[in-house]
Amino acid sequence: MKILVLASRVPDRDGRADQRTVFRLLEFLAQRGHECHLVALAPWDGAGNDRDSVAELCATMRIFPQGRVRAAFTGLTCRLAGYPFQVGAMWNQEMARAVGRLLNELEPDLVYAHLIRTAEYVREKTAAPRILAMQVAQSLNLDRMARHRQNLLSRMFYRLELAAVSRYEPAIASSFDFNTVISTHDRDAIGLPAGSVWLVPHGVDTHEFHPREQEAEATGPVIFSGMLDTPTNVEAVRLLLSEIWPRVIARLPWAQLRIVGRNPSPSVRRMVRRAGVELRASVQSIAECMADAAVAVAPMRIAAGLQNKVLEAMASGLAVVATPEALEGIGARAGTEAVLASSSARFAEAVVRLLSDPERRRAIGRRARAFIEREWTWEHHWRRLEGRMLMAVASAGQSQTDTRARF
């Protein structure tokens, strides 16, 4: 297949969740012999620096810078016109013209737009079938942000964005030939009929994230991982350090906490410094940081879709303590393949019990790894998506043949 791929950030193997997903998809499609043509934005946050690796996976690659001032202007302009701010912030006229030219010049077999932020570039019907990879219910994520952010102005902004996105998601989905989300929970939150959307979850690299030959010591650290400048993870760190970890230390003074991830925000650095826990920023390998960990934690309250940090920890053979929001869509059995905790007190108690019981911790970790190997490899999910892509292309080709035959 010849596929035109649109992304709101340059794909990156080790970047944010959306960047990693598109990178892995391009990697899979290239290995399968498909011809991918990438058009992406390079936003103001500098995300996606390993462009050479991306270029190797694509027949062509066009990247368009999107500065902070431009994003703010187009975001506000589009918001006043009724569109979500995030859709406007990722609108770039030069990219729009390039997409139009490529549709005419390449005549792709398929168009794949990743996230609603890229939907407007190919909203109008094209000769090739169009897939909108919605991935997560942004409305669900925004609702949780509006409820849990500490800053009043932030809560007001997210409430306004929530109203716009709640209208936009089902409307834009109906404009595309096919839609994908990563879980039934996201599908239902958007309000999409069960038969109108493909379920295409994320995956995890089980070669990179794997159990270590030597078991972690009983005093090994508890680990939290993720991009440390996103609202989702900043709020999780705040909850962990203010409400959960003090309870753990009160019971187990020897316990250690390690927070790992790229781009820690100033607020994360302040919280870590006050709490006196370990911070490993901008690490080369999250997997290596998990090697000697005893337990992984995911105290997410602001989240939608799937949490890669949970999949990675489970693949590494770690027992994971997670909130219901962090386990959404994964399907792990609570108490068997992961530990569910719905309050700060219960979360702390679960961590204490696992640190105090190495045998139970190892048993949960072994079952978690087996679960990931069965259900959550990238290859498993991408092969299903590829099959659906091929069917969509074949169906479109048959329709065109039938149309020509009638005339």
Language model feature labels by segment:
Residues 8, 68-88, 131-170, 227:
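Acceptor-binding helix/loop patch of EC 2.4 sugar-transfer enzymes
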Residues 131-132, 139, 158-211:
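Donor nucleotide-sugar binding/catalytic pocket of nucleotide-sugar-dependent glycosyltransferases
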Residues 174, 199-292:
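Conserved catalytic-core segment of nucleotide-activated headgroup transferases in glycan assembly
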Residues 309-312, 319-323:
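Short hydrophobic beta-strand element within catalytic cores of glycosyltransferases
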Residues 338-345, 353-358:
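Conserved acidic donor-binding segment of nucleotide-sugar-dependent glycosyltransferases
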Residues 360-374, 381-384:
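A short, well-ordered alpha-helix in the C-terminal region of glycosyltransferases
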